[in-house]
A protein has these predicted regions:
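Short, surface-exposed, charged amphipathic helix/loop patches that serve as local interaction elements
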Residues: 1-95
Protein backbone atom coordinates (compact mmCIF):
# COMPACT_ATOMS: atom_id res chain seq x y z
CA UNK A 1 0.00 0.00 0.00
CA UNK A 2 2.60 2.51 -1.12
CA UNK A 3 1.87 6.03 -2.23
CA UNK A 4 4.38 7.70 -4.53
CA UNK A 5 4.49 11.41 -3.84
CA UNK A 6 4.11 13.67 -6.84
CA UNK A 7 6.57 16.02 -5.20
CA UNK A 8 9.11 14.61 -2.71
CA UNK A 9 9.57 16.46 0.57
CA UNK A 10 12.51 16.85 2.89
CA UNK A 11 12.03 16.79 6.63
CA UNK A 12 14.91 17.07 9.10
CA UNK A 13 17.38 16.06 6.42
CA UNK A 14 15.39 13.02 5.26
CA UNK A 15 14.10 13.00 1.69
CA UNK A 16 10.74 11.27 1.36
CA UNK A 17 9.40 10.36 -2.07
CA UNK A 18 6.91 7.66 -1.09
CA UNK A 19 4.87 6.55 1.90
CA UNK A 20 4.20 2.94 2.87
CA UNK A 21 0.79 2.68 4.53
CA UNK A 22 0.81 -1.12 4.74
CA UNK A 23 0.85 -0.81 8.53
CA UNK A 24 -2.84 0.12 8.46
CA UNK A 25 -3.60 -3.57 8.08
CA UNK A 26 -2.04 -4.23 11.51
CA UNK A 27 -3.87 -1.51 13.44
CA UNK A 28 -5.90 -2.67 16.44
CA UNK A 29 -8.89 -1.23 18.23
CA UNK A 30 -6.51 0.07 20.90
CA UNK A 31 -4.49 1.84 18.21
CA UNK A 32 -7.66 3.46 16.87
CA UNK A 33 -8.66 4.61 20.36
CA UNK A 34 -5.33 6.41 20.71
CA UNK A 35 -5.73 7.91 17.23
CA UNK A 36 -9.24 9.17 18.06
CA UNK A 37 -7.94 10.67 21.34
CA UNK A 38 -5.08 12.42 19.55
CA UNK A 39 -7.46 13.62 16.84
CA UNK A 40 -9.71 15.23 19.48
CA UNK A 41 -6.73 16.74 21.34
CA UNK A 42 -5.44 18.27 18.10
CA UNK A 43 -8.73 20.04 17.49
CA UNK A 44 -10.43 17.49 15.27
CA UNK A 45 -14.06 18.43 15.05
CA UNK A 46 -17.08 16.24 15.48
CA UNK A 47 -17.41 12.59 16.19
CA UNK A 48 -19.02 11.63 12.91
CA UNK A 49 -16.81 10.61 9.99
CA UNK A 50 -13.47 11.61 11.49
CA UNK A 51 -11.97 9.04 9.14
CA UNK A 52 -12.86 11.28 6.20
CA UNK A 53 -10.80 14.25 7.43
CA UNK A 54 -7.29 15.22 6.45
CA UNK A 55 -6.17 15.47 10.09
CA UNK A 56 -7.31 11.91 10.82
CA UNK A 57 -5.48 10.65 7.73
CA UNK A 58 -2.32 12.51 8.76
CA UNK A 59 -2.44 10.96 12.23
CA UNK A 60 -2.98 7.46 10.82
CA UNK A 61 -0.21 7.92 8.24
CA UNK A 62 2.17 9.17 10.93
CA UNK A 63 1.37 6.18 13.13
CA UNK A 64 1.85 3.54 10.45
CA UNK A 65 4.89 5.06 8.70
CA UNK A 66 6.77 6.17 11.81
CA UNK A 67 7.27 9.65 10.37
CA UNK A 68 6.37 12.59 12.62
CA UNK A 69 3.03 14.21 11.86
CA UNK A 70 4.86 17.42 10.95
CA UNK A 71 6.12 15.70 7.80
CA UNK A 72 2.53 15.31 6.63
CA UNK A 73 1.89 19.01 7.18
CA UNK A 74 4.46 19.90 4.50
CA UNK A 75 3.17 17.58 1.78
CA UNK A 76 1.80 19.40 -1.24
CA UNK A 77 -1.99 19.61 -1.34
CA UNK A 78 -2.34 16.96 -4.06
CA UNK A 79 -0.22 14.48 -2.12
CA UNK A 80 -2.11 15.29 1.08
CA UNK A 81 -5.41 14.50 -0.62
CA UNK A 82 -3.92 11.29 -2.03
CA UNK A 83 -3.02 10.18 1.52
CA UNK A 84 -6.45 11.19 2.82
CA UNK A 85 -8.24 9.27 0.08
CA UNK A 86 -6.09 6.16 0.63
CA UNK A 87 -6.84 6.14 4.37
CA UNK A 88 -10.55 6.73 3.69
CA UNK A 89 -10.67 3.86 1.19
CA UNK A 90 -8.97 1.54 3.67
CA UNK A 91 -11.55 2.20 6.38
CA UNK A 92 -14.72 2.50 4.32
CA UNK A 93 -14.30 0.63 1.06
CA UNK A 94 -11.93 -2.22 1.84
CA UNK A 95 -12.82 -3.03 5.45
Amino acid sequence: MKIKLKEPVEYQGIRVDSLDLTGMESLTGRDLNSVYDLYANMGGSGIIMQEATLLFAQIIASKVTGFPIELFYILKAGDSVKVKNRVYRFFFLEG
